[in-house]
Amino acid sequence: MSESKARSLPELDVEQLQAELRRVKYRRRFARSVLCILLVLALVAALAIAAAYLWLPVLRIHGDSMENTLLSGDVVVAVRGLEAEAGDLITFEVNGKLLVKRVIAKGGDVVSIDEDGVVSVNGAALDEPYVHEAALGTCDVQMPCVVPENTYFVMGDHRAVSVDSRSEAVGFIREDQTAGKVVLRIWPISRLEWLY
């Protein structure tokens, strides 16, 4: 019986054995390479998520308070830890919602808004080419007002509809309340641009 089994096995020469060995080694190498690539991709994805959460919040714009600078549906990237100056866009949380507004003034500045919606800081009218339309909007803050230290006075670019520092519902934004300085619009691709 054992003789017949031995006779039924094909005889392989050295070249065939070497070819089979190369094929098996190639399959192992290929499987290891695929596994390595998948692990690297998983690591890159985890790092990207951590970076987005810790340093680079990505936000989708809802509403029209920042028209024409930002439109509803735009996606922007903010950077945590950057100091904001007048004219910069920042994101901050109010009542559990992340908002994006423009910094108009910082701590110690005096802000006034006239009946026509012209904004002045420290007595000088601002040149605001980004404003959708000048309007006083909802304003229940006494003007002129002094911006408290370590806070920002913020406004939306579409003044007629924006709820911002002119309203006690939002008020002054503490520096530690900000989630980041908005630096880049990434969507839609046709409007990709730096925003600082």
Mark where each language-model region is:
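Soluble "head" domains of membrane/secretory-pathway proteins
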Residues: 2-32, 54-60, 68, 72-196
